[in-house]
Each structure stands twice: as structure tokens, then as C-alpha cells.
Amino acid sequence: DTRALVRRLRIRGAMKGVLSCIEMDNKKLVQKAISSSTMAGADLAQLVMPKAMSTWKEGFTNSLVTYLTPTKPTHHVVALDYGMKQNILRCLVQIGCKVTVLPGNCTSQDVLDQNPDGIFLSNGPGDPAAVTYAHKTISELVGKKPIFGICLGHQLIAHACGASTFKLKFGHRGSNQPVLNLSNQKVEITSQNHGFAVGMDTLPKSLEPTHINLNDNTLEGMKHKTLPLMSVQYHPESSAGPHDSSYLFESFRDMMG
């Protein structure tokens, strides 16, 4: 019964399950669900990141897209790709960035060899705690160049700085998640798609919250108190979706000077 299933998920949170119209033995189906892979500890970014360096030059091609003002290239950004959405790259080009894309498993020296003005850390799938190679790389880059992270990139920054993440009982999915901007007390409607979050009580003293989810009070954004580093859990580049937070790309450009 669909209603019974919804009630169970609402009370107990997201869980593994099997839907079948072939095998009808309940015991076998339960065992299949139990033996299926879990998201916890899964480094899925390895499966979707590119194998080699590339460049990205395409900005917005639709003249009706006006939420970021076109700007001539003034900054060089290295984007670490853990499964990046292409509209993020378009947004970076739109604000005046020459973009070099590197695989998410590159080293900090690989990044610095490109002599970027700023570093972008992308979204991607899986458990952020499992992407340990990225924790190391990012920790070595903090303070060297301005850094901006989105979604998984936000979570990886947290780990690199000593914080931790946890699996949400109910993942944030959809394009109407309300987020409070703590700097101006304005509410932004955001697009979100994540099952893990950064533990706010695990943030080191060097990091401070900037955005909070109004549905469950979880952390949605943070910044470094003294260094040019910021990140958000949601998707300011959403396509399609709300553009209340597109200013973050311009804030990143301003961080680069």
C-alpha cells in the first residue's frame, strides 16, 4: 500500500528497498535489499569525474537568461570536477572567468601549476567522507587561492578544515528549499539535491555559518573568518530552478580581486 510506505519512510527516514513485479517472495526481496550497496562510505565521484584536464568556454547561449551580466574574461579559475553540472561552468564563464577543468582526484600541485586566480570545487555524488584524496588536496590549497565550493565541494571543504558530515534522515530534494542568508536576514529559495550535510556543531573556529535551511535548521553555507573561502550546500546555478542565489558567483569573482 502506497500510503503505508509513505508513512514508514516519513517516520524512519530514507532507507534501502526493492520494488519487484517478477520475484514475489518477501524473504528473498528483503535479503536483496539488505545486500544492496549503501551510500555511506561510497566514493561515487571517482565514477563520474573526467580523466583529463580540459577547458570550458561556453557561457549562456539563450538571450533570455539575464540573471548574470555577461563580462569579458578577467580571471582564470581552475574547477575541480567531482561530477560537475555544466551550468556551473556557464555561470563562471558568464561572470568573466577563463575556466580550466581538472579531475577531482588531482593534486594541489596540479592546481597551482595552472596559476589560477581562484579555485572552484564542484558538486558530485556519494559520501563526502569517503573522498579522502580531495580532503588532502583542498587542505593544501586553503589560503593559497580564493576558493568557492558548491554541494559536494562544500562538504569536502568542511572535511578539509576539520569538520564532519552526516547522512540526513530526509535528504533535501527539489527546487523550493527556503534558506536564510544570515548576513542580511533575507530568505532565498534554492534548488537542492543532497543526502548528506555538514554538522554545524563540528565546524572549527575558523569557519562560520552563512546560510541555514529553514525547514530543518541544517547548515547551508559557510565561510572562513579570515581567508577567501566560501561554500554553499545548494545550487545557485540551478537550471531550471530559482536564481535567488546567483549573486554567489559574483561574490566569488569579487574574492579574486
Question: Where are the language model's segments positioned?
Answer:
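A glycine-centered loop/beta-turn motif at secondary-structure junctions
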Residues: 221-257
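RNA-binding accessory domains that recognize and position tRNA/RNA substrates
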Residues: 2-115, 128, 239-241, 251-257
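Active-site-proximal beta-strand elements of phosphoester/diester hydrolases
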Residues: 76-81, 190-191, 230-234
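Catalytic beta-strand/loop cores that center a nucleophilic Ser/Cys/Thr
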Residues: 185-227
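Cysteine-nucleophile active-site neighborhood
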Residues: 113, 118, 122-200, 241-255
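Hydrophobic anchor at the start of a short beta-strand
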Residues: 99, 147, 229
